[in-house]
A protein has these predicted regions:
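Conserved SAM/SAH-binding beta-strand->alpha-helix loop
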Residues: 94
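S-adenosyl-L-methionine
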Residues: 106-152
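Conserved SAM-binding loop of SAM-dependent methyltransferases across substrates and taxa
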Residues: 73-86
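Class I SAM-dependent methyltransferase Rossmann-like catalytic core
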Residues: 2-62, 76
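A short SAM/SAH-binding and catalytic strip from SAM-dependent methyltransferases
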Residues: 159-175
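Acidic carboxylate diad motif detector
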Residues: 196-198
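Acceptor-substrate binding/catalytic loop of class I
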Residues: 202-224, 245
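A short glycine-rich, Lys/Arg-flanked "PGG" loop and its adjoining helix->strand segment in the class I
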Residues: 175-190
Length: 260
């Protein structure tokens, strides 16, 4: 007789995993245009939450070695962490996203969308931080891109880490999601700060007609997994609705914690 646990395991194994998708064919520019071409208030909320978390990191000054995991075609994580960063690394797997990020970091100007998000960042930090009107020079001097899988993150390397909408958007398997969260939590030195956001009840997403995976998760399930691998967890649920606002998005949970 098959036990419930065996049934659950078999069901999980039939779901698509990270390796089943053509990440090399990910259309980075199409993704950017769809998700960031028209800034949404919830994106601004991510920045405000992240800025508050970063401001609370112990120690003054721009002295942290920080990684963003699964960056994708997105500069928002850089903006959030720049004021406290000595060095910022985008840890990204897809070749297309790596090339897109490298080109974006070399630009001498900001796209209007990025300028909007930087303006939100400056406001979130406040005038006492004296942030410049454009982050272009800060980005060029502090940011770099490393190609790598979330599952291959080195342990205990960074002072702080961010991960926005990555672990749940690379697989349909719960075991792989938890492995990604665990790798994220362990990449920071003990006592370091972890800042993350996860999609809630996402139904999946397409980029240029090609479908990519999302794990359909409740806020409670996300919080439980995150708490298994971090300490001092704080959670805020943002914009969660029944119907998707845009494909693959119906709200998120924002989490902070401390690496063990």
């Amino acid at each position: 007789m098959t036990t419930p646990a065996q049934t659950a395991t078999a069901a999980a194994q039939t779901r698509s995993g990270n390796a089943d998708y053509a990440w090399a064919k990910f259309d980075s520019e199409a993704y950017f245009q769809h998700y960031y071409g028209d800034p949404h208030p919830d994106d601004d909320r991510v920045i405000k939450c992240a800025a508050e978390a970063v401001k609370r990191i112990p120690g003054a000054g721009q002295d942290l070695d920080i990684v963003d995991v699964g960056t994708g075609p997105n500069l928002i994580p850089f903006f959030c962490m720049l004021p406290r960063a000595r060095r910022l690394t985008a840890w990204e797997y897809a070749h297309s996203n790596v090339a897109w990020l490298e080109a974006e970091l070399l630009r001498d100007d900001l796209r209007p969308q990025w300028q909007h998000f930087w303006d939100v960042t400056r406001t979130a930090y406040g005038p006492q931080w004296s942030l410049p009107e454009t982050p272009v020079e800060l980005i060029k001097s502090k940011c770099n891109v490393t190609r790598g899988s979330v599952f291959d993150l080195p342990q205990g390397r960074w002072d702080a880490a961010t991960m926005f909408f990555c672990a749940e958007s690379i697989t349909e398997r719960l075991d792989e999601f938890e492995a990604a969260v665990q790798a994220f939590a362990k990449c920071v030195k003990p006592g370091g700060t972890l800042v993350a956001a996860f999609l809630v009840r996402s139904g999946g997403y397409e980029v240029s007609g090609r479908r990519f995976p999302v794990l359909h998760l409740t806020a409670e399930a996300i919080e439980a997994v995150f708490a298994r691998h971090t300490s001092g967890v704080e959670s805020e649920r943002i914009g969660i609705v029944e119907a998707e606002i845009r494909s693959g998005y119906s709200g998120f949970v924002f989490l902070t914690g401390t690496a063990r």
